[in-house]
Amino acid sequence: LAATEEAVGHWRTLAAQRPDAHTPDLARSLDNHGAMFSALGRPEEALAATEEAVALYRVLAAQRPDAHTPDLAGSLSNFGVSLSAVGRHEEALAATKEAVDLYRELAAQRPDAHTPDLARSLGARSMILRGLGRPAEAAASAAEGLRLLLPYLARLPQALGTLAQGLGREYLAAVSAAGLEIDHDLMGDLGRAIDPDMAAGAKAVGLSDD
């Protein structure tokens, strides 16, 4: 925490002197600072940091959309998580919806670069929808994320395995809360992508009681 706080102070000073050069560094350091606060269980401080980061990235993305729209989308996703952590679920949903919409546009342009990010943001939206008592919509969001991620998981199992497991668990939680039937084909594909042995793969993502 001390290191990220020092980084924010450092980049804030430089951004005041040369905003064009260092505002992106300040925004990035604020996102990191927010993540640290979140990990330490200090959600109000995490929210303040991520909110400032989003405000900075909005300006940057308006000036140079190709360079900074991905940063804005990621920061909005973090902001949504921070809002949810303090009970501001409707605002959290709005932030994650904006992140999802931006990532959809980015993934349409550069699918290999941004489809995993889109899948991650869909998982975040699912968690927030569950918190709002809308589990059927949550299940649909998580399932979409899984379907988008699966082709990339097959190629990059080490890099994307943790994300895939998290999405799988989120999907199952939403399905259970909604009283829906599990899409066993989707879960089977996920298990095989994580582990070629179907049974081992199912256990790896918590999909089997055996």
Which residues are covered by each model-predicted region?
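A detector of tandem-repeat and repeat-rich interaction/domain scaffolds
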Residues: L1-S176
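Acidic/polar low-complexity scaffolding segments in large eukaryotic proteins
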Residues: G191-D210
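Alpha-helical repeat scaffolds
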Residues: A140-A142, E181-D195
